[in-house]
């Protein structure tokens, strides 16, 4: 008798870019896995909106149940599902320096740092991955060089960032990204993460797991770019999820070229 499938939920901001990219990721890497079932659900709001809903209930309400209240699309997809049905919860959101959806009493506080500390375990409240400045940053990656085309951008440029990709990129159509492109994205993002924390030696998998987690990356973003130049180091964290999820064997495949 076959074992029960492990249910995994991907939660993300919108139904456009994020949905297409993560649906492709699920198809490329998880569709052939008999023991894992992926459910994609948009929050139809940014990470601060989600955090605000959870904060009101002192984080006693599961993020899956809050999602049903926030998004009609998610509510429909989660029909008949309970929060306890999901073994793992992953959240993929954009960096949003404006904090437009934070109550006044929390303005000026490091809310994103608090959220990364709260959402740091996929088997509990969920594990949060932040892309800087947004998921569209994957279009910065050049497959041939396996690197990002730009290092940073000004915080003032974030609002127009997604409209800056007029020319064709290697990741122009999310639904057509193949495994080789994803491997290149993983290589580019692990190199960029290492650069962000100013690590000059060869980045091993052990170093990556223990030193390039989402909380550490944000601390370096905040200290070296955001608060020291009004900048963001461009980094897409979706490929970092793949490196963490599929562990060292996958890391070796990515870094073999």
What is the role of each PLM region?
Residues 2-5, 20-40, 48-60, 69-257:
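C-terminal accessory helical subdomains adjacent to catalytic cores in phosphodiester-
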Residues 9-11:
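Conserved beta-strand elements of the Class I
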Residues 14-19:
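Short acidic, Gly/Ser-rich segments with clustered Asp/Glu that frequently serve as metal-coordination loops
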Residues 44:
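A charged nuclease-like catalytic/ligand-binding cleft shared by nucleic-acid processing domains
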Residues 66:
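Ligand-binding clamshell of periplasmic/extracellular solute-binding protein-like
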């Amino acid at each position: 008798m076959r074992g029960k499938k492990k249910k995994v939920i991907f939660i993300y901001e919108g139904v456009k870019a994020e949905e297409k990219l993560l649906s492709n990721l699920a198809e490329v890497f998880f569709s052939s896995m008999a023991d894992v079932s992926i459910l994609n659900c948009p929050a139809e709001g940014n990470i601060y909106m989600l955090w605000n809903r959870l904060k009101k209930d002192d984080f006693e309400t599961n993020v899956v149940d809050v999602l049903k209240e926030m998004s009609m699309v998610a509510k429909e997809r989660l029909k008949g599902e309970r929060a306890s049905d999901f073994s793992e919860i992953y959240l993929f959101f954009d960096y949003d320096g404006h904090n437009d959806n934070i109550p006044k009493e929390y303005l000026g506080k490091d809310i994103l740092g608090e959220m990364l500390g709260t959402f740091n375990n996929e088997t509990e409240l969920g594990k949060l991955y932040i892309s800087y400045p947004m998921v569209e940053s994957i279009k910065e990656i050049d497959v041939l060089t396996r690197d990002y085309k730009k290092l940073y951008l000004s915080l003032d440029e974030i609002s127009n960032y997604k409209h800056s990709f007029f020319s064709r990129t290697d990741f122009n159509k999310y639904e057509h990204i193949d495994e080789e492109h994803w491997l290149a994205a993983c290589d580019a993002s692990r190199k960029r993460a290492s650069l962000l924390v100013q690590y000059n030696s060869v980045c091993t998998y052990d170093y990556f797991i223990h030193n390039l987690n989402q909380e550490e990356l944000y601390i370096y973003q905040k200290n070296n770019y955001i608060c020291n130049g009004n900048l963001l180091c461009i980094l897409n964290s979706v490929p970092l999820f793949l490196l963490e999820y599929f562990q060292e064997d996958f890391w070796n495949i990515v870094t073999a070229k």
